[in-house]
UniProtKB/Swiss-Prot annotation:
CDD domains listed in its UniProt record: RING-H2_RNF181
GO molecular-function terms, A-Z: ubiquitin protein ligase activity; zinc ion binding
SUPFAM superfamilies to which the protein is assigned, alphabetical: RING/U-box
Protein name, as recorded: E3 ubiquitin-protein ligase RNF181
This protein's record includes keyword ATP-binding: no
Posttranslational modification: Auto-ubiquitinated as part of the enzymatic reaction.
Similarity comment: family membership: Belongs to the RNF181 family.
Pathway where this protein functions: Protein modification; protein ubiquitination
Free-text function comment from the UniProt entry: E3 ubiquitin-protein ligase which accepts ubiquitin from an E2 ubiquitin-conjugating enzyme in the form of a thioester and then directly transfers the ubiquitin to targeted substrates. Catalyzes monoubiquitination of 26S proteasome subunit PSMC2/RPT1.
Gene: RNF181
Length: 153
C-alpha cells in the first residue's frame, strides 16, 4: 500500500522551515475545538477602539424637529449656542437635540450620542455582531447573578 504522499505526489511539510504550518494547524485545532476567535486575537477589541460611524440610513431617518416656544431656550450641547425659534434641529433617539452642522460630522466618525453614548446602528457587520455578543454575555451574567441570589435567599 502506497503512502499518502506517494499517492498524491507531494512531499511532507517541514514544520521547522515553515512557521505558517504550525499557525494554520493551531487555527484548525481551535476551530475544531470551538474556541472563540477572541481567544486567538483575531477579532478587533471594540472595547478599546472607536466604534464605526453610524449607518447612513439611520442618520437620514433621524427626526428633524422645528424649534418652537420654550425649546428656543435650549442649547445645542456641541456648540453651546441657543436654538433659534423655527430652526430645524436633529433629534437623536435619546431625545437630545443638535444643530445638523454639529451632529452630522460627529455621526460620520462614530455611532453614538455625544452626551449619553446612546448608539445608532452601523453598517459594520462585525461591530453589530460584537454588540449582540456583548448584550448576550450581559444577559447571561445577569441571569447567573439572579440565580445565585435566589439560591441564598
Amino acid at each position: 500500500m502506497a503512502s499518502y504522499f506517494d499517492e498524491h505526489d507531494c512531499e511532507p511539510l517541514d514544520r521547522e522551515r515553515d512557521p505558517r504550518t504550525n499557525m494554520l494547524l493551531e487555527l484548525a485545532r481551535s476551530l475544531f475545538n470551538r474556541m472563540d476567535f477572541e481567544d486567538l486575537g483575531l477579532v478587533v477589541d471594540w472595547d478599546h477602539h472607536l466604534p464605526p460611524p453610524a449607518a447612513k440610513t439611520a442618520v437620514e431617518n433621524l427626526p428633524r424637529t422645528v424649534i418652537r416656544g420654550s425649546q428656543a431656550e435650549l442649547k445645542c450641547p456641541v456648540c453651546l449656542l441657543e436654538f433659534e425659534e423655527e430652526e430645524t434641529a436633529i433629534e437623536m433617539p435619546c431625545h437630545h437635540l443638535f444643530h445638523s452642522n454639529c451632529i452630522l460630522p460627529w455621526l460620520s466618525k462614530t455611532n453614538s450620542c455625544p452626551l449619553c453614548r446612546h448608539e445608532l446602528p452601523t453598517d459594520d457587520d462585525t461591530y453589530e455582531e460584537h454588540k449582540r455578543d456583548k448584550a448576550r454575555k450581559q444577559q447571561q451574567k445577569h441571569r447567573l447573578e439572579n440565580l445565585h441570589g435566589a439560591m441564598y435567599t
